[in-house]
Amino acid sequence: MARGRPLEIEAELLEAFRRSGRVSEYLVTILPQKLWRMSPPGGRGRTIAAIVAHMQSVRRIFARMGGARPGPPPLDRRTVTPARARKALRQSTNQLASLFERAFQTDRARVKGMPRRAVDMLIYLVQHDAHHRGQMCTLARDLGHEFATDDMTRLWGWKALPPDL
């Protein structure tokens, strides 16, 4: 006899997708603003602001491919602020989650316009964000930032994110 909540694949995938989006927002909020535009040691690579702008750009492309209009806002790597980035990431997470949710509710294998099946696309976007969150954490450390243990456990999902995320 099964115990606990029954398995609901589509709902749990959407929940994990939204949680991944909130983790990206959380990272943006905990990074010191002084690191936001600092060049990587050695001068090669993206700044943290540029990484976040890139993440949003990819999300925006796929949201628009899937029919979101006007789609999530673009971010300019030269002028984006952490507050603006957090808001834009929230919008893109919500718009993409809505596209995936509609596909799941209608038993469609794809979000029309996206290049991959819905589950594959959702997982790709989670992986893409996770990869770039890792880059941001590594860059922050390389620039001298030490993450608090609580922050790291929240980023890794072992501790709940703050309720406003």
Walk through the language-model features, giving the residues of each.
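Acidic catalytic patch
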Residues: F100-P115
